[in-house]
Swiss-Prot record:
PROSITE patterns xref list: UREASE_1, UREASE_2, UREASE_3
This protein's name: Urease subunit alpha
Residues covered by the Urease domain: 131-570
PANTHER family xrefs: UREASE (PTHR43440:SF1)
Biochemical pathway: Nitrogen metabolism; urea degradation; CO(2) and NH(3) from urea (urease route): step 1/1
Family matches, as HAMAP family: Urease_alpha
Domain of life: Bacteria
Binding-site list for Ni(2+) 1: 136, 138, 219, 362
Record gene name: ureC
Residue positions binding Ni(2+) 2: 219, 248, 274
EC number: 3.5.1.5
Reactions it catalyzes: urea + 2 H2O + H(+) = hydrogencarbonate + 2 NH4(+)
Cofactor note: Binds 2 nickel ions per subunit.
Length: 570
């Protein structure tokens, strides 16, 4: 017997379905469900008197014979490829199916088998995304990792050795000994991690030993001397080993101007950090590299989005991070040359146009690693308010804009760093690195963080309480973040040369080393999903005004932001 119910009642019971719309937290961003892969009248739901019971929604199939380890029911997936309602199956730590879960003995159209060995995570009324990827980490302190994880970031790539002055300023781990010690420490953390070695050298030898010692990327940083010779050498070695190069260019233009740096690229693929320039780079026009096919441009989050406070906070932040002395006029001039309201305003618009492809933090070194996701959506909201709907969107929803912005911290950094076959999206065959959100808290405070199929973090009430929800509620590590469960549910990204050797045995680590691949000639700006625009960019050397294809890019600073104080009262 079938029964008709209203959309609102259905959404309350099973979550939104095709054509329903959802507001993302307190932003002006509205998403609309494009497709529902579940079957009306055959939805599965866990609980007393609900569907997932023996002989009903739960079959007799063993895990060995195909039942999933975990099913996330009725979740609204938000990813670069779509905004879709579905059940999601996880088996052996991998996403194995996206579709309709249930018992094939009594239900039609079942793609995902629920058996006695299947656990359930209720996704009704929740949004499911891929875990975030922050590709600009200064490994200054290990406590960063927990803060990033609790914000929804499950992969971190960067450099450093702890609170050394080299690490305060640069995302580089110098030399194979330091790289080895850092990789050994990674067994303690329930996230995917990768090390960038120091790329500043004019001869190949030092770079080769870092790559073979475990680095999955090389970083060129101006504080170590990003000269044309160092750039050319670093890219040449990276081509030989198929690893990515990230660059922080020469703010002072001592060894050349932006044109000289571009010439040293020789058309080779490179990931340009904080492409706007406040985080560092040729002043005032490093932003022009975002127009190049071979440059994969990213932002760091202190300039995201442009607000009335952005300029004021940057000067002191820069002086500390780059070991500068405010009593020295030249140091002060160096700092002031990097902070330009005109290029920061243009950065907002270039993100909205899809010309800036990725978002990252620059953790504790002019960046807040717990705010990569928040600031991405604050930027999207600011642009919706100031620029209106994108041409690809309708008056009903902002689906394309949401896909563009979520790609900036999920699939695009995964592509840029050669790991998109394993992570970066909610797709079958990929590691189950997933984040579940209540729509009212989307982008700010996750409901549940899943890493390699195990719940590793969640908000949790008083452990002595009779139920799990009484206050005080804090984000806490869960069982997946402890013991051997941690090391089998996360990996260390490294070079193919290191993974093929005896590095894991020599270092005595428990985590699996996973090689990066296809990050040189196989990718370009065109590979950046929804973020591959290459407008011709010009910067006025006197006024710092930025033009894209002749059009002035400017916008007012935000006075108020969503996803801000109302979410952090307690």
């Amino acid at each position: 017997m079938s029964t008709r119910i209203s959309r609102s009642v259905y959404a309350d019971m099973f979550g939104p379905t095709t054509g329903d719309r959802v507001r993302l937290a307190d932003t002006d961003l509205i998403i609309e469900v494009e497709k529902d892969l579940t079957t009306y009248g055959e939805e599965v739901k866990f609980g007393g008197g609900k569907v997932i019971r023996d002989g009903m929604g739960q079959s007799q199939v063993t895990n060995k014979d195909g039942a999933a380890d975990t099913v996330i029911t009725n979740a609204l997936i938000v990813d670069h490829w779509g905004i879709v309602k579905a059940d999601v199956a996880i088996t052996a730590g991998v996403i194995t199916a996206i579709g309709k879960a249930g018992n094939p003995d009594v239900q039609p159209n079942v793609d995902i088998i629920i058996g006695p060995g299947t656990d359930v995570i209720a996704g009704e009324g929740k949004i499911l995304t891929a875990g975030g990827f922050d590709s600009h980490i200064h490994f200054i302190c290990p406590q960063q990792i927990e803060h990033a994880l609790m914000s929804g970031v499950t992969t971190m790539l960067g450099g450093g050795t702890g609170p050394s002055h080299g690490t305060f300023a640069t995302t580089c781990t110098p030399g194979p000994w330091h790289i080895g010690r850092m990789i050994q420490s990674f067994d303690a953390f329930p996230v995917n991690l990768g090390i960038s070695g120091k790329g500043n050298a004019a001869l190949p030898g030092p770079l080769k030993e870092m790559i073979e010692g475990g680095a999955c990327a090389l970083k060129l940083h101006e504080d170590w001397g990003t000269t044309p010779a160092a750039i050319d050498n670093c890219l040449s070695v990276a081509d030989d080993y198929d690893i990515q190069v990230m660059i922080h260019t020469d703010t002072l233009n001592e060894s050349g101007f932006v044109e000289d740096t571009v010439k040293a690229f020789k058309g080779r693929t490179i990931h340009a950090f904080h492409t706007e320039g406040a985080g560092g780079g040729h002043a005032p026009d490093i932003i022009k590299v975002a127009s190049l096919e071979n440059v994969l441009p990213s932002s760091t989050n202190p300039t995201r989005p442009f607000t009335k406070n952005t300029i004021d906070e940057h000067l002191d932040m820069l002086m500390v991070c780059h070991h500068l002395d405010p009593s020295i006029a030249e140091d002060l001039a160096f700092a002031e040359s990097r902070i330009r309201k005109e290029t920061i305003a243009a950065e907002d618009i270039l993100h909205d146009l899809g010309a800036l492809s990725m978002m990252s933090s620059d953790s504790q070194a002019m960046g807040r690693l717990g705010e990569v996701i928040i600031r991405t959506w604050q930027t999207a909201d600011k642009m919706k308010k100031q620029r209106g709907a994108l041409p690809q969107d309708s008056a009903r929803n902002d689906n394309f804009r949401v896909k563009r912005y979520i790609a900036k911290y999920t699939i695009n950094p995964a592509i840029a760093h050669g790991v998109s076959k394993l992570i970066g999206s909610v797709e079958t065959g990929k590691m189950a690195d997933l984040v579940l959100w209540s729509p009212a808290f989307f982008g700010v405070k996750p409901d549940c963080i899943i890493k390699g199929g195990s719940i590793v973090a969640a908000p949790m009430g008083d452990p002595n309480a009779s139920i799990p929800t009484p206050q005080p509620v804090h984000y806490q590590p869960m069982f997946g973040a402890y013991g051997k469960a941690l090391t089998v549910s996360s990996v260390v990204f490294t070079s193919q040369a290191a993974a093929a050797g005896n590095l894991a045995r020599d270092l005595g680590i428990a985590k699996t080393l996973v090689p990066v691949s296809n990050v040189r000639g196989g990718i370009s700006k065109k590979s950046m999903i929804h973020n591959d625009a290459t407008p011709k960019l010009e910067v006025d050397p006197e006024t710092y005004e930025v033009r894209a294809d002749g059009e002035l890019l400017t916008c007012a600073p935000a006075e108020v932001l969503p996803l801000a104080q109302r979410y952090f009262m307690f």
